Amino acid sequence: MALRMWASSTANALKLSSSVSKSHLSPFSFSRCFSTVLEGLKYANSHEWVKHEGSVATIGITAHAQDHLGEVVFVELPEDNTSVSKEKSFGAVESVKATSEILSPISGEIIEVNKKLTESPGLINSSPYEDGWMIKVKPSSPAELESLMGPKEYTKFCEEEDAAH
């Protein structure tokens, strides 16, 4: 952890950043805080991600968000078959640093909740885009997905937000 913090502060001091060229076909890029941003996902400015496949949208918090939260120790999630509304809270993440609300980037009906997070909340830290997903939603307004940021926009957003702090 100390090495990670040192690397992050050094990169910030040197204003390092890297991006992946399209010719490498890598599915992710790194912002200057070394957080992973995946291609093929949409991102909210509240640091949630959405993976839309067919009629289902999977939602979780970004690597950037979990980096800032630190070690996640508890997750509060809603029940299946309830509704979420865009930009409204659907749960909370408690870390060793703080408790943060999770805002839904889209509206819809929750069709599945990641029950693994109850027993293993650290999955959000170790695998925010795979095992650490939070809910699966049937979107009620697919057009809401278009208002979210793509990977490049989200990376720039995070860099600007970090520079302001």
From Swiss-Prot:
Residues where Phosphoserine is found = S140
According to its UniProt record, where is this protein mainly located? mitochondrion
Question: What activity regulation does UniProt give?
Answer: Inhibited by harpin, S-nitrosoglutathione (GSNO), nitric oxide, N-ethylmaleimide and 5,5'-dithiobis-(2-nitrobenzoic acid).
What tissues contain this protein?
Highly expressed in leaves, lower expression in green veins, petioles, and stems, and detected in roots.
Keywords per UniProt = Glutathionylation, Lipoyl, Mitochondrion, Phosphoprotein, S-nitrosylation, Transit peptide
Tell me the GO BP annotations in alphabetical order.
glycine decarboxylation via glycine cleavage system
**Cellular component, GO annotation:** cytosol; endoplasmic reticulum; glycine cleavage complex; mitochondrion; nucleus; thylakoid
Q: Which family does it belong to?
A: Belongs to the GcvH family.
Protein name per Swiss-Prot or TrEMBL: Glycine cleavage system H protein 1, mitochondrial
> Which species is this record about?
Arabidopsis thaliana
Q: Which gene encodes it?
A: GDH1
